[in-house]
Amino acid sequence: MSDPKRLHPIAVLLNIIKSIKELVIPFLLVVVIPGKNEGIPGWIQPLVIAIIILLIIGNAFLQWLRFTYRIEEGEFRIESGVFVRKKRYIKFDRIHSMDISEGIIQRVFSLVKLNIETAGGSQADAVLSAISKSDADRINAYISEEKNAYNPFDRDKDEVADNEITAKSSSVFKQTLPQLFAMAATSGAVGVFLSGAVAFISQFDEMIPFKRIFKDYEDFIEMGTFILTLFALVALLAVYVLATLSMVIKYASFTVIKTDEEIVISRGLLEKRRLTIPIHKIQGIRIMENLIRKPLGLATVYIEYAGGSMEDKESLSIMLFPLIRKKHLQKKILEILPVYETDTEMTPIPKRALSRYVFRKFLYLIPIIGALVWFFRPWGYLSFLLVPLAIFWAYMQYRDSGWSIEGNLLLLSSRFFSKQTLIMQRSRIQSITYKKSWFQNRKELATITASIKSGITSRVGMVADVEEKDCLIIKSWYSPKKAVDSQ
């Protein structure tokens, strides 16, 4: 593995696509969208487009030609750069995870993409965009074995190691297709889908004939309220179906496999992805229950771990169970991460804290209602309907707030829109703080906060208006054994 190797030639095409994606909006704004071009010959625009395309293709080829990788002296070494030569040496013991994915183009040529990530990186430290699956598996196995102080010297030993890993691994969770549809339908992806569509369309506002659209819209309004309502419902239903299908495609064939040292998560229909997570890098578990799933006894579970990159938002919090029934949750956690076994029974916050949750909602609500009543009278009076909704929201936040200590585990539960339960090992906690305002002090309440490492940032659990003596119990539980460096 010490001989420099290049990526598969299809990496040239991948580089071209990447460059086009990065330049598409500036290209449309500067070249394609018509503007004031009096006096400029008509052949200039096609010439500019042709030059840009040639530059993109040439740069993509040179990037592929100048990119090499190899394994040497306990390091993964990459050399790249068209004009300025860049050398990146990554020590094996700094590697936190290796993520194998298969895009549509890679799958056509039986290739994969390998991301190698270290702690504290803002992006993947090494990206091999087009290599064979056997090479990716060989790199993964070799680095894992080297990190465990075992050095295979030949192909036979590599195969023995692979067989041993296969024998020790077992599939502990698999999301079924009906469960995936239920997960997608209750995920709230519609809002993300709509916002993405609006953001995309807004980039091309000069190309959209708004005057014609609005003229047609005026004619459309004359068709009546019923037709308008029906049209809006059909449009929302179409967006909902598209958002649901996109989630199902993204998480299709979701499987969790555990070995002695790692958790391997694979998923995807069009783009297959396999993420390998070292168990000793896991910092905590986060359980999320949104407004739809909680009444149904369903939850989504994430792993917080000291890895990932800012470019890949998914790698900061890894989805362990996309959708699982709460009654089966502890059994599955016991199979995968037995150190996080807990009954999740919480100590609730005191009843006198409820008034503070309601009070905080009214601090925001009163100015809003006042403005609506003042500027939109008489329809503004309908804003008073927000009062019972605010009280109900405050009660839900109060009801779902709590804490628990079980051996070396701290559990903090709270709600903004979705209920979050953060399970943390004492040795992984970076800090615990509690503070109290003058108003909290009058009622002997305080706010407790605990943080763990998650990617290059921190994941914070916070519960407001906890009994002050309970905060002191949590602080004293944590103080004797300070959290160790999780890296």
Question: Over which residues does each language-model region extend?
Answer:
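N-terminal basic, Ser/Thr-rich segments that initiate or prime the first beta/alpha elements at protein or domain
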Residues: 1-487
